Amino acid sequence: MHRMTHYTEIPKAVKIRVWERDGGRCVLCGTTRTVSPNAHYIPRSALGLGIDERNIFCACLRCHNLYDNSPQRRDIKDRLTGYLSWRYGDNWITDEDELKYHKGMDYEIKQYEYQGG
């Protein structure tokens, strides 16, 4: 497996952590139907890390599709930024590059403190 693929895929441990953080609900519409913790804030196509829980969120199929494929992406991303920065506070990113794969770097799965809610 290519190193980039390894780091952009979402490991089970990250999915479990994100599911718990988001309460098993779509963070955009609140539904519990068709929800999974497999949506990237920074998409895989832009080298978004899957091993960093701060880059992953729970979304239903509808909202995930809207985020990935609609002109509403910018507005949805603004909402996600608000949600994730609220959840992580000081552990939120200062630059989106923190959530992207960079060739030659070694990455590990980390757990970040987040606010309950």
Where are these regions (language model features)?
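Polybasic, low-complexity binding patches
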Residues: 2-7, 45-57, 65-117
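Short cysteine-rich loop/turn motifs with clustered Cys
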Residues: 9-37, 60-62
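Short recognition patches in nucleic-acid-associated and regulatory proteins
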Residues: 35-46
